């Protein structure tokens, strides 16, 4: 009764209006699952391949080279033939069949988007067949921890058309007692931040992930606004105090790195100063270029002045030495997250563990391309004493799988955007629903989400 009888893929749109793939998996019993695959803008070079159409093919496709008709065809005409008749409850077998048939290191034959769509839809179908929630299906009876959210309130980098080079500035309501309370705290800060930006003459347009995207003079000004918003909202900017709200940064430094010079450049700020954009005419003596050691010193200044608890991709994906040195200095009191560095790949994570390049891994399902491989990576991270942060992508959909995944694996942290844009809110609403379902069994980690930091 749990045999797969039908797999159907469809080209749909993500939150940026770009094509992505939706997959349905149906069983003989009538149970079925559906999944939509996200897409990133700031991507690591070692990520599994997201298959897009060549502009010369699929001429009836309005989306040209951004289309995913080839991935859709691979699901409907190749992967479906491989999986019809398979037991939907055997997730690892389903994933292994696809991975082996693809036969490439980066899933370039079928496309990671095609394989992941089927993998996640199969998991949803399995949960539906057993009539249990997805988090229970994946995590079993121990799945009961809601994640501490990283809420992206100011966007920059590749996610916004503004003057801010670091990609994300986030708040983490560490002093909350429940997930519901963490959202309430974040909501208050978010709306007070909007008022403060408006009062200072800045726009409150939002970036890809729902955070505000103002033109500010430097990263310190961004952090000053966050500190004000936290205080005006009635909370304490702190990594440890009662009702404390901490700050997290995603620098996305691969986008700032010049391989030929070995330096990091604040490109957007440099352009704003060079072209004398309004408000930047008199900006002088601003350091714009950094070696790895200088960037470590810069982060050190920020950490000493602001309650920063987490920095993601502080260095480029090729700068293993920079990551390791930074971790050696700050790794006992700061969460140092690898995203582009490790791309949810257990083989690369193995090197990061050996070289002590970080103490936390960002987990993005589409970086590796299957549920089973994602679970393997998280298990490896936890065994090594690393925390794991479940993450969305900048090009999202209404799919809420990552919310269930965070609870299923008790990761304790999730990064899924701001408190605007339905594609982001959908995940928060799903987590509120899960917390309500778990009732008294629900656990919220708060400060304990950083269990592996000795000197926080």
From Swiss-Prot:
Protein name: Enolase
Catalytic activity entry: (2R)-2-phosphoglycerate = phosphoenolpyruvate + H2O
Predominant localisation class: cytoplasm
Pfam family, one: Enolase_N
HAMAP family to which the protein is assigned, alphabetical: Enolase (MF_00318)
Cellular-component GO terms for this entry: cell surface; extracellular region; phosphopyruvate hydratase complex
Bound cofactor: record note: Binds a second Mg(2+) ion via substrate during catalysis.
Pathway(s) annotated for this protein in UniProt: Carbohydrate degradation; glycolysis; pyruvate from D-glyceraldehyde 3-phosphate: step 4/5
């Amino acid at each position: 009764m749990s045999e797969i009888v039908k797999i159907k893929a469809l080209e749909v749109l993500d939150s940026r209006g770009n094509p992505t793939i939706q997959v349905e998996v149906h069983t003989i019993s009538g149970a079925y699952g559906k999944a939509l695959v996200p897409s990133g803008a700031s991507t690591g070079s070692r990520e599994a391949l997201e298959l897009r159409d060549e502009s010369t093919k699929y001429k009836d496709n309005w989306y040209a080279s951004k289309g995913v008709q080839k991935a859709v065809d691979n699901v409907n005409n190749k992967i479906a033939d491989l999986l019809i008749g398979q037991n939907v409850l055997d997730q690892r077998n389903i994933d292994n069949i696809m991975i082996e048939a693809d036969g490439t290191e980066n899933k370039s034959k079928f496309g990671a988007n095609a394989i992941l769509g089927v993998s996640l839809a199969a998991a949803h179908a399995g949960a539906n067949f057993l009539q249990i929630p997805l988090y229970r299906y994946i995590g079993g009876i121990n799945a009961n921890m809601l994640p501490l959210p990283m809420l992206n309130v100011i966007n920059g980098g590749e996610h916004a058309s503004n003057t801010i080079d670091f990609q994300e500035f986030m708040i983490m309501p560490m002093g909350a007692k429940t997930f519901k309370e963490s959202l309430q705290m974040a909501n208050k800060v978010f709306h007070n931040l909007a008022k403060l930006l408006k009062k200072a003459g800045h726009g409150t347009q939002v970036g890809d992930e729902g955070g505000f995207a103002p033109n500010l003079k430097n990263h310190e000004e961004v952090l000053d606004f966050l500190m004000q918003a936290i205080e005006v909202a009635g909370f304490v900017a702190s990594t440890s105090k009662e009702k404390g709200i901490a700050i997290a940064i995603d620098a996305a430094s691969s986008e700032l790195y010049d391989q030929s010079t070995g330096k990091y450049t604040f490109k957007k700020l440099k352009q704003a100063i060079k072209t004398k954009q309004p408000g930047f005419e008199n900006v002088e003596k601003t350091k714009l270029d950094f070696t790895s050691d200088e960037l470590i010193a810069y982060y050190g200044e920020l950490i000493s002045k602001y309650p920063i608890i987490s920095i993601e991709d502080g260095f480029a994906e090729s700068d293993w030495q920079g990551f390791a040195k930074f971790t050696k200095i700050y790794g006992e009191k700061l969460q140092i997250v690898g995203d582009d560095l490790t791309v949810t790949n257990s083989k690369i994570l193995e090197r990061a563990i050996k070289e002590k390049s970080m103490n936390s891994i960002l987990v993005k399902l589409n970086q590796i391309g299957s549920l089973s491989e994602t679970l393997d990576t998280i298990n490896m991270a936890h065994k090594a004493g690393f925390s794991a942060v479940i993450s969305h992508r900048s090009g999202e959909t209404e799919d809420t799988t990552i919310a269930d995944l965070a609870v299923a694996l008790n990761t304790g942290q999730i990064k899924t955007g701001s408190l605007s844009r339905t594609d982001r809110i959908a995940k928060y609403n799903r987590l509120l629903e899960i917390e309500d379902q778990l009732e008294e069994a629900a656990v919220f980690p708060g400060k304990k989400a950083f269990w592996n930091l000795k000197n926080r």
